[in-house]
Amino acid sequence: SAFNPHEKQLIGDLWHKVDVAHCGGEALSRMLIVYPWKRRYFENFGDISNAQAIIHNEKVQAHGKKVLASFGEAVKHLDSIRAHFANLSKLHCEKFHVDPENFKLLGDIIIIVLAAHYPKDFGLECHAAYQKLVRQVAAALAAEYH
């Protein structure tokens, strides 16, 4: 396994506390606000023209929840992340034509959101374990692109 028992424990302990809807919505909102050129993938979501519109956009919030719930599946499948994301990778590559760099960016934003919401839990070791996790998820999602 890429994760040792201690890392698995750290990842699981924090994940049980995560409010997936709230943190997921915030993570996707942050990506669209901080990297406005990424909005082109979400033009069918209605008004995403500025920070307030994005934060209050129900489709952005719902998709953010969906994205973070999917990330939560990686937490449950730490030993088979690549296999678990094979179909999503194919979908994002072939149907949505998403730049795989986005997966790394969103992973880093997920780290920021978790650190902001759970500062007592998000110590150095937890940060290292989650950084490893977001890297593996990003690599798994980019797998179909190679």
Curated annotation (Swiss-Prot):
Gene3D superfamilies reported for this sequence: Globins
GO cellular component: blood microparticle; haptoglobin-hemoglobin complex; hemoglobin complex
Quaternary structure, from the entry: Heterotetramer of two alpha chains and two beta chains.
Organs and tissues of expression: Red blood cells.
PROSITE patterns cross-referenced by the UniProt entry: GLOBIN
Family to which this protein belongs: Belongs to the globin family.
GO MF annotations in UniProt: haptoglobin binding; heme binding; metal ion binding; organic acid binding; oxygen binding; oxygen carrier activity; peroxidase activity
Superkingdom, natural source: Eukaryota
Source species taxonomy: Eukaryota, Metazoa, Chordata, Craniata, Vertebrata
Organism name: Crocodylus siamensis (Siamese crocodile)
Gene: HBB
Role this protein plays: Involved in oxygen transport from the lung to the various peripheral tissues. Has antimicrobial activity against B.subtilis ATCC 6633. Has antioxidant activity.
One Gene Ontology term from the biological process aspect of the record: hydrogen peroxide catabolic process
Transmembrane segments: none
Keyword Heme annotated: yes
Pfam families (UniProt xref): Globin (PF00042)
InterPro entries: Globin, Globin-like_sf, Globin/Proto, Hemoglobin_b, Hemoglobin_oxygen_transport
Keywords: Heme, Iron, Metal-binding, Oxygen transport, Transport
Amino acids binding heme b: 63, 92
Name of the molecule in the record: Hemoglobin subunit beta
Domain Globin, chain residue ranges per copy: 2-146
